[in-house]
């Protein structure tokens, strides 16, 4: 039997595991017994069966644990016990109230898109947890509401090995995941897939490649560039260097990069591998850009003292400087990449917010043929 290549097995996010635990505990309230396994719908629509441990029901509460399997890209949360305690709320019929418990971080600063003082459970996992709980609860929600408490025993210790403290998240880890799937981004297998995808585009006669950092940015640029065939779009993940080195080797003439503020800042500051755990975002750079586009000195100081790229974006939006800020950031990205890859390809940067809404686009002044108001160059299909 042919073995599966090492480094290709995907895993599941803390958000997906939390949703599965919450669903299992909710089923425990409905049926009187927590199941040993549960089928859970991920944010990407995929349905996956998770093993459930330590399931129990005690009166109007139920408890379930899903142990995280990060696949072939184990991070610090691999094997963490994502735990859900679900309790009836007789006075809140139809409500699903989500809370953070032991080992889930608390937000202490603005800039993460989450309420200060609330749990570090990101928006997509929040919606996914609630959707799974509602689906499992069924008619139960016609008689009562449900309180869902997500906890991670040992999460405070795990968080010490993350960048949460720099982001103002204290007391535990974050519950994350936009698709529910952990891809092995740090493996040779994923790097090889990025290289291969660019080679395929070149071999099919394309002279444009559109590089994105993930699923949301890829959907964004696909909507912006509907004239391009799917082969032109490549999710490079964190592997900018491998992607652009392959572009040069294959002789592709045009590169479009789609991204959000965090990854783009890392590219602008010269990072070639943009994984969150490698180096922090340079907020001094963001403060300089904010000053460049006219932000007051006190705002620039706040940005400089923050640890989050998103905070800078939010402050610029409040000031009505969001477009100018992103255009300046895009120019910094082009300048940095041009120093590393002089005259090898044209560059255009497309930028979106965290909901994949377009914020700005910039291109090199010497590449008018790549303006997005007109069709991009396209090779033979």
Curated annotation (Swiss-Prot):
Enzyme class: transferase
Its EC number(s): 2.1.1.195
A GO biological process held by the record: anaerobic cobalamin biosynthetic process
Keyword terms of this UniProt record: Cobalamin biosynthesis, Methyltransferase, S-adenosyl-L-methionine, Transferase
Record keyword Kinase present: no
GO molecular function: cobalt-precorrin-5B C1-methyltransferase activity
InterPro entries associated with the record: CbiD, CbiD_sf
Pathway participation: Cofactor biosynthesis; adenosylcobalamin biosynthesis; cob(II)yrinate a,c-diamide from sirohydrochlorin (anaerobic route): step 6/10
Cystine connections: none
Official protein name in the record: Cobalt-precorrin-5B C(1)-methyltransferase
UniProt family annotation: Belongs to the CbiD family.
Gene of this entry: cbiD
Gene3D superfamilies the record matches: CbiD-like
Source organism (scientific name): Methylococcus capsulatus (strain ATCC 33009 / NCIMB 11132 / Bath)
């Amino acid at each position: 039997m042919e073995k599966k290549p090492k480094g290709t097995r995907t895993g599941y996010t803390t958000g997906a595991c939390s949703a599965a635990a919450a669903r299992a505990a909710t089923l425990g309230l409905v049926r009187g017994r927590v199941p040993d396994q549960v089928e859970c719908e991920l944010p990407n629509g995929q349905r996956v069966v998770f093993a459930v441990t330590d399931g129990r029901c005690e009166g109007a509460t139920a408890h379930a644990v899903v142990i995280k399997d990060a696949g072939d890209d184990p991070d610090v949360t691999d094997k963490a016990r994502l735990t859900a305690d679900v309790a009836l709320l007789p006075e809140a019929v139809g409500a699903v109230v989500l809370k953070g418990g032991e080992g889930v971080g608390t937000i202490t600063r603005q800039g993460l898109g989450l309420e200060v003082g609330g749990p570090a459970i990101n928006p997509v996992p929040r919606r996914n947890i609630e959707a799974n709980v509602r689906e499992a609860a069924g008619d139960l929600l016609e008689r009562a509401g449900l309180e869902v408490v997500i906890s991670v025993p040992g999460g405070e210790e795990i968080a010490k090995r993350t960048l949460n403290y720099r982001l103002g998240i204290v007391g535990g880890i974050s519950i994350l995941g936009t698709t529910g799937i952990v891809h092995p981004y740090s493996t040779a297998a994923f790097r090889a897939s990025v290289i291969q995808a660019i080679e395929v585009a070149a071999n099919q006669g394309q002279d444009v490649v559109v590089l994105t950092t993930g699923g949301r940015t890829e959907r964004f640029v696909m909507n912006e560039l509907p004239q391009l065939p799917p082969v032109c779009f490549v999710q490079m993940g964190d592997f900018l260097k491998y992607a652009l080195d392959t572009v040069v080797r294959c002789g592709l003439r045009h590169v479009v990069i789609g991204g959000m503020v965090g990854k783009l800042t890392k590219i602008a500051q010269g990072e070639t591998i943009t994984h969150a755990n490698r180096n922090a975002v340079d907020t001094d750079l963001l403060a300089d850009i904010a000053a460049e586009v006219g932000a007051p000195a006190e705002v620039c100081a706040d940005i400089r003292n923050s640890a989050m790229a998103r905070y800078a974006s939010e402050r610029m939006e409040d000031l009505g400087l969001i477009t100018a800020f992103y255009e300046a950031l895009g120019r910094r990205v082009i300048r940095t990449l041009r120093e590393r890859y002089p005259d090898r390809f044209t560059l255009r940067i497309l930028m979106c917010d965290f909901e994949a809404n377009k914020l700005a686009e910039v291109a090199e002044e010497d590449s008018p043929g790549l303006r997005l108001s007109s069709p991009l160059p396209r090779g033979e299909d």
